Amino acid sequence: MGDTTEKIILIMVTREDLFAAPFFYGNVDLDEEKLKESIENTNILYGLVSEDFDILHGSFDWLYGPVNRFVVEVMEEMEFYGPHSIFTSWLTATIKENEIKSQDHMHMNSFMSGTLYLTENPSPLMFKNPLPWRFQNNESAMNITGKLASNKYVYQPQKGEIIMFPSHVWHQIQSNDSEDPRYSIAFNVLPTGTLGNWDSTVNLKVIK
């Protein structure tokens, strides 16, 4: 009789996670007196968002320097060494009595977006997986911890933290359950100047 022993073939599996969305985190020191004065001097529309959409050159101009330094570090980390523009920035208010949270949204016509958190216990920020698949292996895929299986991630920021992420990532500000208003500055960034090479060269300029 022939040898009927089952042969076991070992298959070596390796893994490399490609095309991740880069998220960047940092901290900014906040001057409490300037912060209070700036919030008081900002006109908030409908109790939600500032009327001024260039607030880092307005009532919060003292924060432009530290925010821009963080932006420079992020852009250089992604190998964009040329000029850039923080072309929009605004104050966002999350207030309990409004009893609403933001709609799912992304930031159109922008490269990177960011948020600087100004007050204690900021509202969580939920991000949605930008990859196109929507299969999930089980209920745990809906939690906040999985990096590959999950299609959502909830970021719990702290006062003074600053975050930047690709503008195409859908996200949603969660509701405020505390009695105190929560404030943050959101902003959008574009690389400017000459980008690309050969037939892909483009010159970007932000006109305000």
Model-derived regions, located:
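Non-heme Fe(II)/2-oxoglutarate
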Residues: 5-82, 90, 101, 201-208
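Short beta-strand His + acidic residue motifs that chelate non-heme Fe in jelly-roll/DSBH
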Residues: 102-105, 171-178
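A short hydrophobic beta-strand segment most commonly corresponding to one strand
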Residues: 114-115, 179-195
